[in-house]
Amino acid sequence: MKGQETRGFQSEVKQLLHLMIHSLYSNKEIFLRELISNASDAADKLRFRALSNPDLYEGDGELRVRVSFDKDKRTLTISDNGVGMTRDEVIDHLGTIAKSGTKSFLESLGSDQAKDSQLIGQFGVGFYSAFIVADKVTVRTRAAGEKPENGVFWESAGEGEYTVADITKEDRGTEITLHLREGEDEFLDDWRVRSIISKYSDHIALPVEIEKREEKDGETVISWEKINKAQALWTRNKSEITDEEYKEFYKHIAHDFNDPLTWSHNRVEGKQEYTSLLYIPSQAPWDMWNRDHKHGLKLYVQRVFIMDDAEQFMPNYLRFVRGLIDSSDLPLNVSREILQDSTVTRNLRNALTKRVLQMLEKLAKDDAEKYQTFWQQFGLVLKEGPAEDFANQEAIAKLLRFASTHTDSSAQTVSLEDYVSRMKEGQEKIYYITADSYAAAKSSPHLELLRKKGIEVLLLSDRIDEWMMNYLTEFDGKPFQSVSKVDESLEKLADEVDESAKEAEKALTPFIDRVKALLGERVKDVRLTHRLTDTPAIVSTDADEMSTQMAKLFAAAGQKVPEVKYIFELNPDHVLVKRAADTEDEAKFSEWVELLLDQALLAERGTLEDPNLFIRRMNQLLVS
């Protein structure tokens, strides 16, 4: 063969092959689904390119995939007459994994076989799945529009290297031959192969044909029998499609091994005509937070495949949605640039967004357990919604889930509708607190009075929460209120104090003046508070000041953080505050006040500028 060379696999390929063969063996038949799915993609790509260059069909426009086997040679062959590959494409697609973050993904895999198989399934193994059942794979291919002598040969045993060479191939497309491992004879059985193809390929539009050999007049006559329906699933009537078919189609388009949580199939006629089939996965893709992660729907125009990952039809906070849209209103020569500025696209995006939010609302209402699975996988992404989509903010807010003081659990199961239904008589606001962790939120001294009054507080501990709450200002006409900020409604709760207590407070006015004089500009104000029951002091921020959590977000992003000026609030009923107020020695008084302030800052921020000084002060006061 001309131009023959032997190349080494990209190191990640070797590791993936090893893990895949061991992790996916229990579900080994999926290799056929993956290879037929790739053939379907190759046909879609040829149809799309042929829109502008019909000569690419080379007089053969009847696209199909064929499956045949040779029992004597123990080979199984999957061939298509799709777009084919050039030599460079063969090296690029079959010798490397062109995905960012592959190395870190592989490092995340461990020895848990069930978990590994799920992760590898999410990764989309495609062509490499052939090595689950084959100890050698041979590929012969020629790209559409290339001369026969520009065919390409590729072969590998999946060990560490592969051979590539130039060949002559008369027909366009790709032929993959699997040299089956010992013990894999089931894939040489006609009935077994037929059943696998029927299971995985009934929903794709490409005809899948299996070879039939018959003896006639002493000669072997070869014919091809179509064994799938070869009708695009989304074009069929919903009443004719089984749940199993919907699930298999999801696995086909998403390259996911897991069943979806739910789906929505709709045909819309009228001003705009389109069909959509949208799925909510049951597990987040491993690279969902990678900036290079592609997302979006498959786009078809009048049943002709146009592109993968058309992100223009779904907002970023719904990037986990998989599926397709088939539009009758877009031109066949549509490009990503045209989609960006198209009124049709904007209208479709708005309609599909509402469809997904309704689908999630229905899931939450009908199956709380499944919705909790969704929330655990995609809740953080959905929390981007209130800032990105003001038009649907109320609908998104209904889907949010939180931990709260109502449940003694860090699980985020409380909806805003749940919270509102439990609000106390006369309560006008929805109270919440943001913190670095659930434990920090739950034990915050800011909650003491609210707990005493039996008022529920939402406990927010995801990094995105503070940012989200800047945009989510109310729900069901009720404003949100952070309990770590000074607020009139909180003051009202705290001011329910008897007259004798108020008289006692007046006596502490000189003490407050001494504290103000000592701390000066380091705090915004010093005041007494009745918001505390067990804690001597807290710090809080004014309504118009940057919160502690927002300051942390700025710092983590490397941005300049404006100084946060706290209001220092002291509990007049606490023994430590009384002791400080009774201390006449100025040095000792200073130690007490600084210690109380440090305690309050530590509870609020989780850190101190000088923890050693704090420890020294505490030790001195303990021994004095």
From Swiss-Prot:
Q: Spell out the GO cellular component terms annotated for this protein, sorted alphabetically and separated by semicolons.
A: cytosol; plasma membrane
Care to name a GO molecular-function term for this sequence? unfolded protein binding
Q: Where in the cell is it found?
A: Cytoplasm; Cell inner membrane
On modification after translation, the UniProt record reads:
Phosphorylated.
InterPro entries linked to this entry:
HATPase_C_sf, Heat_shock_protein_90_CS, HSP90_C, Hsp90_fam, Hsp90_N, Ribosomal_Su5_D2-typ_SF
Principal subcellular localisation of the protein:
cytoplasm
* Residue ranges, annotated region (Mediates dimerization): 585-624
Note down the stretches annotated as region C: 553-624
Family note: Belongs to the heat shock protein 90 family.
Bilayer topology term: Peripheral membrane protein
B: annotated span: 337-552
> What name appears for this protein in its UniProt entry?
Chaperone protein HtpG
